[in-house]
Amino acid sequence: MKRLYQQIVMLLASTIFGWAIIAVAAFQGIWIAVSSRYPMAFDEAYHYNLIKLHSDIISPIIYQQPAGQAPYGALARDPSQLYHFLLSIPYRLLESVGASEFVTVVTLRMFSVAMFCWGLFLFRKLLLRTKASAAAVHAALLFFILIPTVPLLAGQLNYDNLQFPLVALTLLSTATFAKQIVQRKSWLGQAMWTVLLSLLGTLNKFTFLPIMAAVFTYMLWMIWRHRLHGRKRTTFKQWQALQKHTRRVQLGAIAILAVLFCWYYGVNTVLYQNPVVQCHQVIDPSRCASFEPWERNYKLAQTEQSVSPNPLRFSVDWTGGMFYRLFFTINGATGPKRYTNHVAMPIAMAAAVLSVCGAVITLRYLRRILAHDPVFVMILFAGMVYVVSLWGRNFNDYLNLGQMVAINGRYLHPILLPFILLLIAGYQHAFRLMPGVKLVILLLAIALFSVGGGITGFIHYSDADWYFEGQVFLVKLNDLSRTIISPLFLWRA
């Protein structure tokens, strides 16, 4: 048993296995991108229409509110524009050659798949900077891509697919900055890259703000801890040591991004007391009625509903809602049945049991896991700030609207990998002298995650209404695949 365990660990730790995981993730994303009828459930129509809107203007930002109704909210004050601007470039090319909607949507979805796979590569690189073994890191990546909503999101148009690599890239830059400080190397250039990436992330999606806050807090703490504050002469020498071209690029990019950051978040805060404004704060509510999230919240706010202000009770419901929407498979807004969703019980039950037991075990060994691992501490700190921010925003909506809204598991994707790795580390410490037990847990977990995990749930639960219309080959391919994986779902009988 011990020898078998060692062989499996060697396989998991191999670079080939790491690349194989990324290849499987790409395959899954491409499958979803090619098969799924437009629009998919995760606001894909909203993002596609904004891409088209960006293609009609020269400026990379929308600085003037379009006339008429506001189906996309207060666009002129919305900072989340980077993803839509970037994809508007290939959209223009596709439009110029007269590509069909099928070709256009699938092609743009491929860019989303590429962004996600880039993020997976960067997160692998980041997590290998921790004290965790390569086998543990690759196991975390494997379980992550088997979460059903991960390939579903990767294969559609959504700015979360760009947010994923931006979070990884920023944290990777922060880790490099910290390493240079500890080793007493020149750190100023890396600090500037980190600031640049943080600003860029906030212009892709406003939920990057807590990540930026955590990163800046950590950077300032590192500077203070190593007594680098006040050393103007040293900082000036580092500045002079940077190549002129690098200095100009960094300063120019930071200046542009900082101006945009202040234009959106700064002006919003000053004028509307909110860095992310509500539609009715900027334009007439009658025009906002066509913006579905605003209309939903507006109607809920008009209805007096008493809710328990107990944060513990909310947290239980919030955790359950997040968990369900991490592990469900869902179709889009078209077809006879809209937003039909299913959860495969084997993967859901396995994830629940492993998470709860793993959390208890991890708390027992947390100090030992994080000892002498500042990179892991930094990553988890940023992740915790993000989760608390997300929870706080949802709790505030709950108190003001009387219902839980926007409880979506996919919002956890950008920071989920480090926490999966933390749970794996907990199991490793708890059973460090029992390789046979670790092997059984690992193989059983992989087996259960295979039932409904990745794209298997999509293939099993979907039907012709879930696929692009008129694409007979796609229907036959999914039907054949459903037959092949049907033995995994015998538990339903």
For the regions a language model picked out, list residue spans one by one.
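Extracytosolic helix-loop segments that constitute the early lumenal/periplasmic catalytic or substrate-binding loops
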Residues: Q28, A45-D78, L82, R92-E95, ...
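Short acidic/glycine- and proline-prone juxtamembrane loop motifs at membrane-interface regions
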Residues: A41, T149-Q163
